[in-house]
């Protein structure tokens, strides 16, 4: 279609060049028609008609022109990034993961993914929203969200003033959600110090003694066993025990559990990326052992990536104003979510608890939860994947800011999963999907994809179960069954805009289902507590049988 439109535009231009005499003949009547008649007055109606005709012709040519210019611009940017990816960009030492020179077919710039044996390519680039927000039309959407926040604040203040007769500036929900914060701080420090010391110490001992050991296999199995004990026993059960034993509130639990998962993934990446280098060094009988420095490992623990490299592309300076703006937007999103719960969620579930559980109540709850659920989705994406990661990237001068792609343009769920969270997707792609294919066989791609879905679904459900203090596998069912089915059915071959509409519709509905089901279960467990709950009471849905007592 684009090729035909280009040819149509070129044909029109070529015809105008080939027949200048005809064009001149066509212009003459137009000139004559605009000339003043014998009475000295200009025919206004004729002038307006001519102007409308010229405008219509310009509008007709506009889409062809814009598509041709856009196509040339895309080709130019693609070639430019492909060339820059092959260079040592700003101190980005690609070492063994550098791009092979002399290849005839370079990798597409939109993916910027090297072959599996070389790993992810890091290059200096900005986040997509930073570029889009420079466009006035996109920035207006940002301003709309700010205006909506102002209206939420005004609505809350006015309602509280009418009900209480005074301005109520208490943020009881926020103070409750982030309660017992000192426990969060010392737990985080223990997790950080253990992740900083134990994996590095174990790897250093194994790497220095591997080539000298008379039983390298036993030595490797021993250190690998100790590393697994640390990952599962200390970093796995330790934080979980703290959040349960100290009965931390939900937001405080989320901080600890998310940091726990992040440290586990970081430690795995550090070992996974460096073990092959030591094995290759021993195989080549090199005199030096490639052990990263402590500073390199420490930088990686704070860098906004889950893929270890000895060095990354770095920006020359830190823009502290930009850092302050990103953190300010994060705190703004926290208050935004607070007002969404106060003005949209709390009234909804206060009314729901007055009726027994039924299909009608459930359907109304799901559809009434779509708007707050979608707003929370947008705010979570913007606060964490854009603002939080960009703030740390700027402080560390980390150059590669592609934490997400244009997931909102996805016409398939497979593309949505790849572009929504690039940071986590890269880890799953290289250490779960590719390692599964390497360990078993490249023929089992569907099984590898299923394994990745299972790992992701289990980790998500684990985080929700621990943070909310109950097991209610709604997310697991949506992710493992519907999400996986959509991934195969609505695949990358779907390119028409209608599939983007379908993707958004299902995404909206899914967020409404999640917010409705988990909120109902939360309220049910608050209003229908059990005196001596058993293990089954933690996994059996309380909202199905709870009858609220007032």
Swiss-Prot record:
One of its GO terms (molecular function) is sterol O-acyltransferase activity. Residues 161-180, 245-252, 353-369, 469-474, 529-550 are lumenal. Residues 15-34 have a biased composition (Basic and acidic residues). Residues 1-138, 207-218, 277-319, 396-443, 491-496 are cytoplasmic. GO terms for biological process: cholesterol efflux; cholesterol homeostasis; cholesterol metabolic process. Residues 1-36 are annotated as: Disordered. The keyword Ribonucleoprotein does not apply. A motif (FYXDWWN motif) lies at residues 403-409. One of its GO terms (cellular component) is endoplasmic reticulum membrane. Disulfide bonds join 528-546. An acyl-CoA binds at residues 415, 418, 421, 425, 433, 445, 456. Keywords: Acetylation, Acyltransferase, Cholesterol metabolism, Disulfide bond, Endoplasmic reticulum, Lipid metabolism, Membrane, Phosphoprotein, Steroid metabolism, Sterol metabolism, Transferase, Transmembrane, Transmembrane helix. InterPro entries: MBOAT_fam, Oat_ACAT_DAG_ARE, Sterol_acyltranf_meta. Its main location: endoplasmic reticulum. Expressed in most tissues, but most strongly in the adrenal gland. Expressed more strongly in liver Kupffer cells than in hepatocytes. The chain crosses the membrane at residues 139-160, 181-206, 219-244, 253-276, 320-352, 370-395, 444-468, 475-490, 497-528. The active site is at residue 460. The modification N-acetylmethionine is found at residue 1. It is an enzyme of class 2 (transferase). It is found in: Endoplasmic reticulum membrane. Cholesterol binds at residue 137. May form homo- or heterodimers. Interacts with UBIAD1. PANTHER family: STEROL O-ACYLTRANSFERASE (PTHR10408), STEROL O-ACYLTRANSFERASE 1 (PTHR10408:SF6). Catalyzes the formation of fatty acid-cholesterol esters, which are less soluble in membranes than cholesterol. Plays a role in lipoprotein assembly and dietary cholesterol absorption. Preferentially utilizes oleoyl-CoA ((9Z)-octadecenoyl-CoA) as a substrate: shows a higher activity towards an acyl-CoA substrate with a double bond at the delta-9 position (9Z) than towards saturated acyl-CoA or an unsaturated acyl-CoA with a double bond at the delta-7 (7Z) or delta-11 (11Z) positions. This is Sterol O-acyltransferase 1. The lineage of its organism: Eukaryota, Metazoa, Chordata, Craniata, Vertebrata.
